[in-house]
Design a protein with these regions (language model features):
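Conserved pre-ATP/AMP-binding loop-to-beta segment of ANL
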Residues: 41, 165-183, 190, 213-220
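Gly/Ser/Thr-rich phosphate-binding loop
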Residues: 267-272, 282-340, 352
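Conserved AMP-binding/adenylate-forming core of the ANL superfamily
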Residues: 21-25, 42-73, 80-86, 90-94, ...
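Conserved AMP-binding A3 loop
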Residues: 54-56, 179-206
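Conserved AMP-binding/adenylation subdomain of ANL enzymes
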Residues: 202-220, 228-269, 284
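Structural core segment of the AMP-binding/adenylate-forming
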Residues: 1, 68-75, 98-161
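Conserved ATP-binding/catalytic segment of the ANL
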Residues: 363-368, 372-421
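Flexible, low-complexity linker/hinge segments
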Residues: 18-27, 155-178
Length: 421
């Protein structure tokens, strides 16, 4: 099987301590963003179809929209982002944060009723929507008694923001400032809010980089996950900026289109995700993927056939991982290729994994025995918004069933159907 020469060279640089993999320490997401804008203003930041923004333009658009947001929402107020994957979504996220607001992310495909359930948990002071879903979001906004702004065509256009060129907002933001609320359905299907301050969110961003280290100003990312999902928020918004990188934005996953974009833009980091995404690309027409070197995967079980076919096609392994909105990335396959089929890799630094008996006794199980997966670590929450603690002694029950191998790899095999958290 032909191995990727690109990947081999990059891993060599990583093993030799090349500073291109090093990141500056930040206590908040806003400082991270503006540092990137100042460090590489002429660098390509966002590409969507035939539209693109440099980091200087990205910053100008963010500053312009932040000024509008500040007229409606005070610092530490809450802004719901309900925009499909787009340049507008990325601008909206950083604009709200730069205005000092806490953001919540909502799936742009949701109905008014589904959005209403999220807004009951975390009532917004302002809702930002895209053109495609402005009517649905508008109905939800009326029900929540919150103002709505459409970002993009039919509302505040990016081009309009670029013309205003306002100064960067002067808002004091610290690691303790509220940052983001993401929603998870858990095993009950009822949404729950996962709330993080800036310091906690930066710990998730850094964990993503630990699992999948990338090169400063050398990568081109392509994300297919919804930006409202924890995977999409990081792979399609936060981590490309953390690496001063270009991001190719895909509104919807279409295998033929994505394969062509990966070739055209020389994509080096593909956010991937579930097995179905990789299977779709395997069925797409041949494309030149020689610039590609990093392919994370997760959210579903990968068959041996899918893993083998992808590696045969690209010379690259799919780096399976296990993560949750409640803790970010938790385990990941080693970059060096020492994978164990059927597992999601080893616990990342700062994360502990335990397996508990399914009888409710709390008894910890040895290797190779199925039980409920428990997680503990600095970025793992202990409670959901407005609900009592669910973690005991720091251990959060995941609702997933799995086992650990004797050398510490985690395998996820099922979902605990009757668990209420």
């Amino acid at each position: 099987m032909q191995k990727s020469k690109t990947r081999s060279e990059i891993l060599r640089r990583l093993s030799e301590g090349d500073p291109v993999f090093t990141r500056k320490e930040y206590s908040d997401v806003v400082t991270m963003f503006w540092d990137t804008v100042e460090a590489c203003p002429d660098q390509l930041a966002l590409v969507e179809g035939d539209r693109s923004l440099s980091y200087a333009q990205f910053g100008a658009a963010v500053a312009g929209l932040a000024a509008r947001i500040s007229q409606i929402v005070p610092p530490s107020g809450r802004v719901a982002i309900c925009i499909p994957n787009s340049i507008e979504a990325n601008v909206a996220i950083y604009a709200a944060l730069s205005a000092g607001a806490e953001i919540s992310t909502a799936n742009a495909e949701y109905t008014p009723r589904e959005l209403g359930a999220l807004f009951e948990i975390a009532p917004p002071g302002l809702i930002l929507a895209g053109k495609r879903n402005s009517n649905v979001a508008g109905e939800a906004a009326d029900n929540a008694h919150a103002p709505l702004i459409t970002v993009g065509e039919g509302g505040i256009a990016i081009e309009q923001l670029l013309d205003t060129q306002p100064a960067r907002p002067e808002v004091k933001i610290t690691g303790d400032s509220p940052c983001i609320i993401m929603f998870t359905g858990g095993s009950t299907g009822a949404p729950k809010g996962v709330q993080r301050n800036h310091r906690s969110e930066m710990s998730v961003i850094k964990a993503m980089h630990t699992a999948w280290p990338t090169r400063v100003q050398e990568e081109v990312w392509l994300n297919v996950a919804p930006i409202s999902h924890v995977w999409g928020t990081h792979m399609g918004c936060f981590n490309p900026v953390y690496g001063h990188s270009a991001l190719i934005i895909v509104p919807r996953f279409q295998p033929d289109l994505v394969a062509g974009m990966m070739e055209k833009h020389r994509v080096s980091v593909f956010s991937g995700g579930p097995a179905a995404i990789y299977q779709g690309l395997l069925a797409a027409p041949e494309a030149d993927l020689s610039a590609l070197w990093l392919c994370p995967g997760g959210g579903s079980v990968f068959s041996r056939q899918t893993l083998s076919r992808w590696e045969a096609k690209t010379g690259l392994p799919i780096l399976e991982a296990f993560g949750m909105t409640e803790g970010g990335p938790l385990t990941a396959q080693p970059l060096d290729g020492t994978h164990q089929y059927g597992t999601t890799g080893l616990p990342l630094p700062g994360i502990e994994v335990a397996i508990a008996a399914l009888d409710g006794s709390g008894k910890r199980l040895p290797a190779n025995e199925n039980g409920e997966i428990l997680i503990r670590g600095e970025r793992v929450i202990d409670r959901y918004m407005g609900l009592p603690p669910v973690a005991e002694d720091g251990w959060l029950p995941t609702g997933d069933i799995g086992f650990t191998t004797p050398d510490g790899f985690l395998a996820v095999v099922d979902r605990k159907k009757d668990m209420l958290i």
